[in-house]
Amino acid sequence: MNFFKFTAIVTDHIPRALRQTFRLMWDRKFGPVLQHWDDSEAVRRSFAAMEGGTTTIPTHQSYEEWDCTALFQATIFAQSFALPDSTGHSKTLSGLYVKPLGLPRGRFHASVVSSGGDDYETVALAIDQLRLLRNSLFHPAKGEMSKPTFNQYLQLVKDAFKALGLKTDEIDGIGSEVGFPTSEVANLRRKIRNRNMAIYGLGVGVGLL
């Protein structure tokens, strides 16, 4: 059941966490000068315009429908939240804080809290950690996960949530469950199958999502 418990975290709880974080990021930066994120067509058009008018983020849809890939694109890969580097060039949060680390494939960030007290770096590292954890589920999924691996991943998720200022109560609840209803397992299997078909059918590298 460890695999399915982690799948539930990835498919249900991480997207919700990313939406909360995106909305908070937007409201902090654009709320006072533009408008707070109310998920209206108008605010989504404004976001699309800030991304250059052409974006892979489905801004024509409610952000409640955005999947993890879109939410990563809308946060750490978004031009809207880009910051200047030491030379004054604008870089996305991923480009500024994550890419320079050169993290090897299959590895996770040792810490998601900025050693220098940079809140933007903490947000970037925490979101990227969730991206790495999400990718691990589909790389490739065998339907099995050892208890030590599950415990490690669970702690990484909790650390990322805490760094983003999010509650971990529901994650703790999943960690303590002894099993899932058969119907829930079937639903999780379907989500994995559909996700794998989308990834490999399009020939998209998981590491790029």
What are these regions (language model features)?
Residues 1-136, 140-191, 195:
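Feature for intrinsically disordered/low-complexity regulatory segments and propeptides
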Residues 188-209:
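Long, hydrophobic or amphipathic alpha-helical segments
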